């Protein structure tokens, strides 16, 4: 099908860059992977998403801004590559999930350690995508990791480690795909690459 798959496992939102002597810098990545086409939108096959009225600007929470800076997602927010909110009721940074210009879901990251680390607000199984101007995708587990790579390639967050049909449909739109799951999901990453 012409889709090229490359695999190298690293945690995208930390300082680890893979095995010793192997790095993927922003400049070398841009030289290697020249965008060929704009990814297409996917069709949301789920019910309409209604954004809760507890979502406010990220700037209303210092903890939210500090979290975004720590995981290297704040620059993507400032550049307009992602649409973020703060959920005042649940104390979460909220990453809005889009299909084109339409908001179809949201994923929230807990800031206080109470409740689940990540919470999916809607019923869509769409992945979170950031940096849609590239023909190269980097598959990661969470939204923050997708934001941390979106200045170089498109970040596609699975919101977990399971590869769903909806994720595959999005990934088919890219010429090259990296899989960069956390170290504890290495076996799943290898399975994805072989799929």
Language model feature labels by segment:
Residues 32, 77-78, 159-162, 179-180:
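Short, surface-exposed linear patches
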Residues 87-176:
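Phosphate-handling DNA/RNA-contact segment within nucleic-acid enzymes
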Residues 12, 142, 160, 182-185:
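Short beta->alpha junction loops/turns
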Residues 1-77, 81, 88-92, 100, ...:
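Non-catalytic accessory segments of DNA primases and related replication-initiation nucleases
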Residues 173-186:
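A structural-propensity feature for long, helix-poor, extended segments
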Residues 1, 140, 181:
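Single, functionally critical "micro-switch" positions that shape active/binding sites
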Residues 192-195:
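Short, intrinsically disordered, charge-balanced linker/junction segments flanking boundaries
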